[in-house]
Every structure is written in structure tokens, then in C-alpha cells.
A protein has these predicted regions:
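A transmembrane-helix-recognition feature enriched in membrane-embedded lipid enzymes
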Residues: 118-132
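A structural signal for short, hydrophobic/glycine-enriched beta-strand patches
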Residues: 1-109, 114, 118
Length: 132
């Protein structure tokens, strides 16, 4: 099997490194042979990830693909990849987040983690509806 990693250099992050480069480093650190990793490092959003990955998957005759991304991002990624490629994707969500609310009244106080979660969720909702 081969692994396709997709993601370009995001303007608000370190421009020298792409998301795909970071994924390659992670996978090789885990022991995945570098010659089994296929790189797409030009895309800047999920729609472009799907479009630019299409050529890689088509040349290899892929019919069924595991789509690995964060749990929060999976709905949007799956919709866009299925729309662009029209092949079967099996969703493999990572980094599920589960947290218990603190007891008592403290749970009603403002919290930076909650604000970050709201920001990430809003980004996914907007991205999902914009990508339709």
C-alpha cells in the first residue's frame, strides 16, 4: 500500500514547510518507508487537497481509499473528496476530543479551550457549506 499526504504551505504558518512535509516526517519517524509515501504539497485548502490528490489516485487506479483526517474535519473532507473523485472513501477520523465538564458553577465561566473549540467548529461549518 501507499500513502498520499496532501497539504501546502499555509500563509499564516511557517512558509518554508508544508503540511505534507510535516506528515512525511511524522510517517517516516513511525517507520513508514519513504518510497511508499506520495506527496502533494501545493494545495491550500480541502477542495484543492481533493483536486490535486485526484491525479495521484487516478494514475494508480485507486477504487477504495482510506481518508484520514481529524474528527472535526472529516465531514467536510469526506464530502469534498467524494464529490471530486467519485470513488469509495472509508473515513478514518483521528484526534477525537472528549472532555467532562467540570463540576458545579465553574463550568459556566469563560474558557479559552471552549473559545478555540467554537472557532474550529465555526471554520468547519463555514467550510462545509462553502464547499457544497
Amino acid at each position: 500500500p501507499e500513502i498520499v499526504v496532501s497539504g501546502g504551505a499555509l500563509p499564516w504558518r511557517d512558509a518554508a514547510a508544508t503540511e505534507a512535509d510535516a506528515a512525511v516526517r511524522f510517517l517516516t519517524d513511525l517507520g513508514v518507508p519513504a518510497n511508499r509515501i506520495l506527496l502533494e504539497s501545493a494545495s491550500l485548502d480541502t477542495q484543492q487537497n481533493a483536486q490535486m490528490t485526484e491525479a495521484i489516485l487516478r494514475t494508480r487506479g485507486a477504487r477504495k481509499v482510506l481518508l484520514v483526517t481529524s474528527a472535526l474535519h472529516m465531514r467536510r473532507a469526506l464530502a469534498q473528496f467524494e464529490q471530486v473523485l467519485g470513488i469509495e472513501f472509508i473515513p478514518v477520523a483521528t484526534d477525537h476530543e472528549v472532555a467532562a465538564d467540570p463540576p458545579g458553577l465553574i463550568r459556566w465561566l469563560p474558557d479559552t479551550d471552549a473559545l478555540d473549540g467554537s472557532r474550529r467548529a465555526l471554520k468547519e461549518y463555514l467550510g462545509y457549506w462553502a464547499g457544497r
